[in-house]
């Protein structure tokens, strides 16, 4: 990958000039000028996904200049580097190959002179065999009973991805009850353990190194809870499996290394649901549906790696995001799925985006003087409409939004889905076009009221509009379409990182807090007053100790 400061390109300078021309142009004006705008600014993927980006403050000229930026920063070369196994995560000297995990074409992908696909396929086959034994009931616990509950113990990418997907695919769920524990707060695991039986529970300990503090603390508590009933350490092997590469530590914990599922250093945590970390997904929806998930992602991988920028969906969404973040000064994006099963999707890509592109140093090691990753947040519709949409509609901040919905619901109960989708369509229309003062006054007249007597209320009912949105309409949320949707967002994030000249696949920002926590932990174990920190931290620790005593 080339290290190119995007602000030093001629495309960036052209975009700055273009922004000066566009900043006061409204979405309403853009639609009024072009009756064919929707067809020009939307695209369909595999007849399964319609992406409508017409309600944005962009023109064909805007997209052309953004695509020039992608060319000048060598996005095409960056894509080729990732897919070919080049070590583009330079700060950790690692390749970035989550795409290999879903490489259903099985074409060779080489890292350090070795094709990784045989090992990828071997782990997949091992996951299939293990999961089929658990799901069928042929795998028995220490008292001879089949497994009924699975508890995934992980954190970050070892938790957010599997939890999001198992929730999104609940319509495909089998009889196994799934539970996820991540927080080192003992309350999290305590509440889960209240609802499971040690005789019929399988724990998945998801930690590449088998040393992650939060995960191993929870794993040891789960083991202690289990042994309080089971008694004999040998029974651990029937109730614990590991998603790890540290065979020695796994064995010492009591897990049979035959039930250790490996993944590789070229699998980043927040891109790991496609790997052994996805075992909980397989146990929830079955191996065939997991393969469909992989296949959907692979289809999007092919689209991303082979489609020209002007028709490439992840690239288009990424470029539009850069346009808002760096030229309009919009520092945030909302992800708003109109599907209750997708209630963890925004949280998943909050990590996916903010941990990937929340960087202030470029690939040359220099502080940037432009915006990098946006703040990502969101909740399912229509709940969000009754919470924070007020600010999106009438606040002083521009919040570009992605609205996501399925045309076909898994629960066609009465007229629930038409009502849900009517809100989905209405919100993007309202955000784009708003409601003028004239319309508000006419509404009063239609109600037989004199607008003059209500003049003091009118300004509060005016919606300026001109608030940008993307709409992603899926035919139906299936394992395949969900896989494609996740990969769409993954590649959007990669594209933005490549263009903005940052390293997307490391996460050094999580380290300092962990180091300081390890230093502070011993100080919390006795009653002595602490004075080794700043006055604020000392004061907080000492008050904690006083109240705990």
From Swiss-Prot:
Give the reactions, separated by semicolons, that this protein catalyses: alpha-D-glucose 6-phosphate = beta-D-fructose 6-phosphate
Q: Does the keyword Cytoplasm apply?
A: yes
Record EC number: 5.3.1.9
- Which Pfam families does the record associate with it? PGI (PF00342)
The positions flagged as active site in the entry are: 355 (proton donor), 386, 514
Write out the annotated subcellular location: Cytoplasm
Is the keyword Cytoplasm in the record?
yes
One GO cellular component term of this record is:
cytosol
Pathway annotation from the record: Carbohydrate biosynthesis; gluconeogenesis; Carbohydrate degradation; glycolysis; D-glyceraldehyde 3-phosphate and glycerone phosphate from D-glucose: step 2/4
Which InterPro entries does the record associate with it? G6P_Isomerase, G6P_Isomerase_C, Phosphoglucose_isomerase_CS, SIS_dom_sf, SIS_PGI_1, SIS_PGI_2
What would you give as a GO molecular function for this chain, any one? Answer: monosaccharide binding
In which broad location class does this protein mainly occur, judging by the first location in its UniProt entry?
A: cytoplasm
Keyword entries, A-Z: Cytoplasm, Gluconeogenesis, Glycolysis, Isomerase
Q: Gene3D superfamilies, per this entry?
A: 1.10.1390.10, Glucose-6-phosphate isomerase like protein, domain 1
Q: Name one GO biological process term.
A: gluconeogenesis
What does this chain do? Catalyzes the reversible isomerization of glucose-6-phosphate to fructose-6-phosphate.
Q: Which family does it belong to?
A: Belongs to the GPI family.
This one is known as Glucose-6-phosphate isomerase
Organism per entry: Klebsiella pneumoniae (strain 342)
* Annotated gene: pgi
């Amino acid at each position: 990958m080339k290290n190119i400061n995007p602000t030093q390109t001629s495309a960036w300078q052209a975009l700055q000039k273009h922004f000066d021309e566009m900043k006061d142009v409204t979405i309403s004006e853009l639609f009024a000028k072009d009756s064919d705008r929707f067809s020009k600014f939307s695209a369909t993927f595999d007849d399964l996904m319609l992406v409508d980006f017409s309600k944005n403050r962009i023109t064909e000229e805007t997209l052309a200049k953004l695509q020039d930026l992608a060319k000048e920063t060598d996005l095409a070369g960056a894509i080729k580097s990732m897919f070919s196994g080049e070590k583009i995560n330079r700060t950790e000297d690692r390749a970035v190959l989550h795409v290999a995990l879903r490489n259903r074409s099985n074409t060779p992908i080489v890292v350090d002179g070795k094709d990784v696909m045989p090992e990828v396929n071997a782990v997949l086959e091992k996951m299939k065999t293990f999961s089929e034994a658990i799901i069928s009931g042929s795998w028995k616990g220490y008292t001879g009973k089949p497994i009924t509950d699975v508890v995934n113990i992980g954190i970050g990418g070892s938790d957010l991805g599997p939890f999001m997907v198992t929730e999104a695919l609940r319509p495909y769920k089998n009889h196994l009850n799934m539970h996820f524990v991540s927080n080192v707060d003992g309350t999290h695991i305590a509440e889960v353990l209240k609802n499971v039986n040690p005789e019929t529970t399988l724990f998945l300990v998801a930690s590449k190194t088998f040393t992650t503090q939060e995960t191993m603390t929870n794993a040891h508590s789960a083991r202690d809870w289990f042994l309080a009933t089971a008694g004999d350490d040998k029974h651990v092997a029937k109730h614990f499996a590991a998603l790890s590469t540290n065979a020695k530590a796994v064995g010492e914990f009591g897990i049979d290394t035959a039930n250790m599922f490996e993944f590789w250093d070229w699998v980043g945590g927040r891109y790991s649901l496609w790997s052994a970390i996805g075992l909980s997904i397989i146990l929830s929806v079955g191996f065939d549906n997991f393969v469909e998930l992989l296949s959907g992602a692979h289809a999007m991988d092919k689209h991303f790696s082979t489609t020209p920028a002007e028709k490439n969906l992840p690239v288009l969404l990424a470029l539009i995001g850069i346009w808002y973040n760096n030229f309009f000064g919009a520092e945030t994006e909302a992800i708003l799925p109109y599907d209750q099963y997708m209630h963890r999707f925004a949280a998943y890509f909050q990590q996916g985006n903010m941990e990937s592109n929340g960087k202030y140093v470029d690939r040359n090691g220099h502080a940037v003087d432009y915006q990098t990753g946006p703040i990502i947040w969101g909740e399912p519709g229509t709940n969000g409409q009754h919470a924070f949409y007020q600010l999106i509609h009438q606040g002083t901040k521009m919040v570009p939004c992605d609205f996501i919905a399925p045309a076909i619901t898994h629960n066609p109960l009465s007229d629930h889905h038409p009502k849900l989708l009517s809100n989905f369509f209405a919100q993007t229309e309202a955000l784009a076009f708003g409601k003028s003062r004239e319309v508000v006054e006419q509404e009063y007249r239609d109600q037989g009221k004199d607008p003059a007597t209500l003049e003091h209320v009118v300004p509060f009912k005016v919606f300026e509009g001109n608030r940008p949105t993307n709409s992603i309409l899926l035919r139906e949320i299936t394992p395949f379409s969900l896989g494609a949707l996740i990969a769409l967002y993954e590649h959007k994030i990669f594209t933005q990182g490549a263009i903005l000249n940052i390293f997307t696949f490391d996460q050094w920002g999580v380290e300092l807090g962990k180091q300081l926590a390890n230093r502070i932990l011993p100080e919390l174990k006795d009653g002595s007053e602490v004075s080794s920190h700043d006055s604020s931290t000392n004061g907080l620790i000492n008050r904690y100790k006083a109240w705990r005593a």
